[in-house]
Amino acid sequence: YYYFTATYPAYDRICIRRSATINGITDAPEREIWHKHETGVMASHIWAPELHYIDGKWYIYFAAGEDKKTWEIRPYVLECADEDPYEGEWHEMGPMLAHRSPRKRHGESLRAFNGYDPYSFTEFSLDATTFEHRGKRYFIWAEKVHRRFGISNLYIAEMEAPNKLKTVQVLLSTPDYDWERIDFWVNEGPAVLKYGGKIFVTYSASATGQMYCMGMLSADEDADLLDPKAWSKKRYPVLQTDPDRKVFGPGHNCFTVGDDGEVL
């Protein structure tokens, strides 16, 4: 089967569609597998769910705000241990957890010692994705670093468990070019493709709308993926608005394998 999930227009639930063919997703019936909370966390702005199969279980990573702090967007995790995520039962694992420092080191802040690392998921965080490479699993997400100006960067970390990071965040990409800074300085919506000896990460840039476009990062498959120097960024968008082709504001893609075995 092909499985499909996406932001629901009412921002209040997560649904899954299932089809034997990729074209069949369009008209496939959808099943609601989770609904937002009435109060507290996970109560508003249910955004950008992604479905992943990890170590024999299914997981959905999504972003959500609180009922009274709707823009306190953070990543959360759902888990399904059944074979079919469309038919199976889903459970909340709660928020995605940052790496916990094992002990206090000289010069380390009290905040870092008493809790999780003081950087990951402390501000507006969303659009999480995950991938495995050579026995290690990685987590990539978008997070704002300046509360007032709101620069959205991409970060990467190794994972300890499906709902917890093993390392502190590493800056993967920040809006460097003019085409990443239209109306808002944004890098978000990462998607990963392993192909031809490379690790590719596509991402979305600028404000949503006609100016929304897509950039691309790449690293050699033998590189240390937590080393920022291992990654290179294309200087120009790989997809952008093209009225002649009736393409407007492309962004936040995914990759899959088509019915004919080709990468889509």
Regions found by a protein language model. Give the residues of each.
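Carbohydrate-active catalytic/glycan-binding domains of CAZyme proteins
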Residues: Y1-L264
